[in-house]
Amino acid sequence: EQVFTVTGGGAMFLNQSLGGHEKLRCTFMHHEQACAMAAEGYARIAGKPAVVMLTTGPGSVNALNGVYGAFTDSIPMIVISGQIKRETCISFNDVPGMRQLGDQEGPTIAMASPVCKYARLVRSESDLEKMLPEAYTEAISGRPGPVWLDIPLDIQQSTQVINIAPALLAEPKFDTDKLSKSCREIISKLSASNRPLILGGTGVRLSG
């Protein structure tokens, strides 16, 4: 429902598509870091993730500080960045020793992966059929956090029709034996204490 963005040439078709969508509200910012931090605040208040839409290279790098904050605080966030066209992108070409091939190219996914639950470079239009639902599910399931999709410019402008299935919330995974043991330990310690103090963290909120 909510998109925070700074427009840029590397994301021009994303800008057009999301910015003109009647069911999406786009808020245009002055800096990409502000986009990520606004998305974090939105998720805290609304209880659901917002989209951060970025351009390639420096635009994506600028957002990493806010994305890292969401990662450490378990806040869901969906980051969609533009990447240069595949023809001039190092990830699609064998050019040993080069650090940059295209204009304002950056190793976006390599930088985003350590601070995201899910980070993928979209290599073809059909990748989106799988990656979009996977990314959304990962963002909101289990311990929430940011996810990142990097989409080359020529894929952005493609007119190929794709079918994207609805994302599903992943089933929580519990080890009932460990949970029972932990509960018994907590009860034992509470019973033996005189003035117990309980510090509730984010996990309490996430558990519902």
Model-found features: residue ranges?
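N-terminal alpha/beta PP-like core and its mobile active-site loop of ThDP/TPP-dependent enzymes
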Residues: 1-208
